[in-house]
Amino acid sequence: MASLIQVRDLLALRGRMEAAQISQALNTPQPMINAMLQQLESMGKAVRIQEEPDGCLSGSCKSCPEGKACLREWWALR
């Protein structure tokens, strides 16, 4: 089980990461990592970076059966 400090340190070492990458690197369930990232964000230590939809080649993300699964969400330290 990872701690909040380990999540922060991993982000410091690697720059920006997705929650799934952090979960895998720390061998911790993703819901727990999501909660830790939310806590770091509320403390002003981490920032959420969301990709813009202009990366969608077809421009049909709204009608995509996967919703907006092609839009990635990254986390980085402030």
UniProtKB/Swiss-Prot annotation:
<feature type="binding site">
    <location>
        <position position="64"/>
    </location>
    <ligand>
        <name>iron-sulfur cluster</name>
    </ligand>
</feature>
<keyword id="KW-0479">Metal-binding</keyword>
<keyword id="KW-0678">Repressor</keyword>
<dbReference type="InterPro" id="IPR015102">
    <property type="entry name" value="Tscrpt_reg_HTH_FeoC"/>
</dbReference>
<dbReference type="Pfam" id="PF09012">
    <property type="entry name" value="FeoC"/>
</dbReference>
<keyword id="KW-0411">Iron-sulfur</keyword>
<comment type="function">
    <text>May function as a transcriptional regulator that controls feoABC expression.</text>
</comment>
<keyword id="KW-0238">DNA-binding</keyword>
<feature type="binding site">
    <location>
        <position position="61"/>
    </location>
    <ligand>
        <name>iron-sulfur cluster</name>
    </ligand>
</feature>
<keyword id="KW-0804">Transcription</keyword>
<dbReference type="InterPro" id="IPR023732">
    <property type="entry name" value="FeoC"/>
</dbReference>
<protein>
    <recommendedName>
        <fullName>Probable [Fe-S]-dependent transcriptional repressor</fullName>
    </recommendedName>
</protein>
<feature type="binding site">
    <location>
        <position position="70"/>
    </location>
    <ligand>
        <name>iron-sulfur cluster</name>
    </ligand>
</feature>
<keyword id="KW-0805">Transcription regulation</keyword>
<feature type="binding site">
    <location>
        <position position="56"/>
    </location>
    <ligand>
        <name>iron-sulfur cluster</name>
    </ligand>
</feature>
<dbReference type="InterPro" id="IPR036388">
    <property type="entry name" value="WH-like_DNA-bd_sf"/>
</dbReference>
<comment type="similarity">
    <text>Belongs to the FeoC family.</text>
</comment>
<dbReference type="InterPro" id="IPR036390">
    <property type="entry name" value="WH_DNA-bd_sf"/>
</dbReference>
<keyword id="KW-0408">Iron</keyword>
<dbReference type="GO" id="GO:0051536">
    <property type="term" value="F:iron-sulfur cluster binding"/>
</dbReference>
<dbReference type="GO" id="GO:0005506">
    <property type="term" value="F:iron ion binding"/>
</dbReference>
<dbReference type="GO" id="GO:0003677">
    <property type="term" value="F:DNA binding"/>
</dbReference>
